[in-house]
Amino acid sequence: MEFKVEKKGTNKAVIEVEVEPEKFEEGLQKSYLKNAKYFKIPGFRPGKAPRSLIERAYGEEVFYDDAIDYVLNETYPKVIEESKLEVVSRPEVDIVQVGKGKSFIYKAEVYIKPEFGLGEYKGVEIKKIEYPVAEEEVEHELEHLREENARFISVDREVQNGDIVTIDFEGFVDGESIENGSAQDYELTIGSGRFIPGFEEQLIGIKKGEEKEIEVVFPEDYQSQELAGKKATFKVKVKEIKVKELPELDDEFAKDVSEYETLEELKASIRNRIKEKNDKRAKDEMIDAILEKIAQATEIDIPEPMIENQINYYVEDVVRNLQYFGMTYEKYLEAIGKTDKEFREQFRERATKAIRNNLILEKIAKVENIQATDEELEKELERLAKMYNLEVEKLKERLSEDDIEYIKEGIILNKAIDFIYENAKIISEETQSESQPE
């Protein structure tokens, strides 16, 4: 087998492959063995007629289709491997020559990862981004901790806004019970807005053990068409009234909810955690700004199949999430009023940017000879094993060579990101002010 590659532009290639006649003959024989049973030749049982008689009766080309498929499947993957082309699409195949006793020649046109020259990627100037920790953020986290550790205490008084009440209720429309319109020991927070407008407000003032008939009107846009806009009566009994009691913010609280001895230590821990989150956000945004500047100085002709594959990835992720909530993709599209094409199109810009950035980082890694070391691979495998609650050796047993290569590629891309960040010129406001003439 011989082949030659012709590049077309920066992201396409045409491969011409010449396969020896013996290989095509092998394909013809396999096609004959597969299909002989479908041909009727007088004097022979199905599948027993010689190939030559079938070809004489039905034409020499009768076994060509499957023979061609066989040769393509046998040779194309080897050609791609030997050519070292980074193919990103299915091939468009054109048969140049085919026939018994002849070399089988075909052309395969494919999209490949684009070739491009890198713009300047060292010393890229960007503004420093910072997100200082606001005291309000710390207070918000503390309030969240208080809410998580609140106690609920029964009280013997009238219902007030904000109370948690336990009720029995039954709803009626035109004197008939509402289907699924009743419940026992139902917990409701007054003022939460979980019930029909007007329901919760009418419970205010009722005491524990009391019953009351509440009249409401279902909203016009209510989910059940049968009830939308209709008047309803609910018979309600208040069985328990509870109030939420938040713990005091003091040293005892800190000891109860954390490993710290004092409230100030707890606050410091929260502050550090928020700072780490804010610093990561700032760094991510600065890296994005660096990549954007490199991209502006770099011209890449991204093949459409690469973009479509990335869009497929995003859509499949949405479908998986919808399935988790018991919803089909078709129903979701109907609910948001979009076609499949419109929904996919909204991911195009994001997909293009993701591919562009990855291509740039791959190129930088290649130019700078950035590799994944054995130690880095082992560390990443340990992290993944911990994530999936597996022993490292068990995880290794499950991973294929392709999986390992994929993990290595991730390590290399992350190191390339670190490289451009460490080599960027990050200018703070103070530096800008100092450099400006008076």
Curated annotation (Swiss-Prot):
Belongs to the FKBP-type PPIase family. Tig subfamily. Keywords: Cell cycle, Cell division, Chaperone, Cytoplasm, Isomerase, Rotamase. Consists of 3 domains; the N-terminus binds the ribosome, the middle domain has PPIase activity, while the C-terminus has intrinsic chaperone activity on its own. Residues 162-247 form the PPIase FKBP-type domain. Its main location: cytoplasm. Involved in protein export. Acts as a chaperone by maintaining the newly synthesized protein in an open conformation. Functions as a peptidyl-prolyl cis-trans isomerase. The keyword Cell division applies. This is Trigger factor. GO terms for biological process: 'de novo' cotranslational protein folding; cell division; chaperone-mediated protein folding; protein transport; protein unfolding. The keyword Aminoacyl-tRNA synthetase does not apply. Transmembrane segments: none annotated. Its EC number is 5.2.1.8. GO terms for cellular component: cytoplasm. It comes from Caldicellulosiruptor saccharolyticus (strain ATCC 43494 / DSM 8903 / Tp8T 6331). GO terms for molecular function: peptidyl-prolyl cis-trans isomerase activity; protein folding chaperone; ribosome binding. InterPro entries: PPIase_dom_sf, PPIase_FKBP_dom, Trig_fac, Trigger_fac_C, Trigger_fac_C_sf, Trigger_fac_ribosome-bd_bac, Trigger_fac_ribosome-bd_sf, Trigger_fact/SurA_dom_sf. It catalyses: [protein]-peptidylproline (omega=180) = [protein]-peptidylproline (omega=0). It is found in: Cytoplasm. SUPFAM superfamilies: FKBP-like, Triger factor/SurA peptide-binding domain-like, Trigger factor ribosome-binding domain. HAMAP family: Trigger_factor_Tig.
